Amino acid sequence: MTVSYGAPGRVNLIGEHTDYNLGFALPIALPRRTVVTFTPEHTGAITARSDRADGSARIPLDTTPGQVTGWAAYAAGAIWALRGAGHPVPGGAMSITSDVEIGSGLSSSAALIGAVLGAVGAATGTRIDRLERARLAQRAENDYVGAPTGLLDHLAALFGAPKTALLIDFRDITVRPVAFDPDACDVVLLLMDSRARHRHAGGEYALRRASCERAAADLGVSSLRAVQDRGLAALGAIADPIDARRARHVLTENQRVLDFAAALADSDFTAAGQLLTASHESMREDFAITTERIDLIAESAVRAGALGARMTGGGFGGAVIALVPADRARDVADTVRRAAVTAGYDEPAVSRTYAAPGAAECC
């Protein structure tokens, strides 16, 4: 039996690098999706093909970390995690199509892993609840691919719903729906892809996580969430000033997430926009994960009339989001494109987007 299963990319409205610190985040699922079509066969491997790559990749069912590399490592990691948890995985043929841009900060990796998990589960009749699937997906990304990411991307892909943002508490692993329908208030969410690509596997992302872990250790706690209620004064006990800045971002970002959710409840998109901009400033000044190109896009959007703008995703490239009055959307988009090109960068791809359904079997 051939099955098809789709999983979306995501935009994190606010709450960056908070998930592995057991804080808060507020993502939405995107209309852009990765679809995996899987036909089980009596073989000892899965042959995977992607519309983003030439040729095919062979994934042995008994694969181990490091055996499969490149784009296919994410699919292999999903297979490895399923089998490690005792779930059945048959051999077969797997076809992957996607309109989630790789390296754009929209979590193409989580979309791929989620779609593979869903397709194999649907083909075998295996029922795995969404939280467990998110944990399997994180295990695939952390332990097979080697990217030290948290649960945010996977929870967003699995729990996403139309006109809904997801307030995630990573300490308790709870997901609370929050109405997100800016169009009803004549506001649009612009997605501005800088075309500067980034990678999570290794590098700066891992350094930021290690910095946060050192800060927590200096404070005598297991995670920075444990000092959230103490306020910024608690950070004086952190030995390294850079680690202290990283921790300050996490604590202030957690509060911005809660304030943003409250603003949505009041349909106050002016306040929500201001929080986006404050988040971007914190990522630039305290967490040091933006770039000159990303800063230019965010700042140009605000100057042109956006209510607020911020980078979304792990950093060092990717995309910027902005809340924009509907009647200013074209001017903001044109201004951002022109500013980037004038500065010598590729023209950003600017589009409207919205909260869409989460992962599901395709008809």
Curated annotation (Swiss-Prot):
Broad class of the protein's primary localization: cytoplasm
Subcellular location: Cytoplasm
Active-site residue numbers: 153 (proton acceptor)
Enzyme nomenclature, EC number: 2.7.1.6
Reaction catalysis annotation: alpha-D-galactose + ATP = alpha-D-galactose 1-phosphate + ADP + H(+)
Any Pfam family the entry gives: GHMP_kinases_C
Pathway annotation from the record: Carbohydrate metabolism; galactose metabolism
Family: Belongs to the GHMP kinase family. GalK subfamily.
Protein function: Catalyzes the transfer of the gamma-phosphate of ATP to D-galactose to form alpha-D-galactose-1-phosphate (Gal-1-P).
The name this protein goes by in its record: Galactokinase
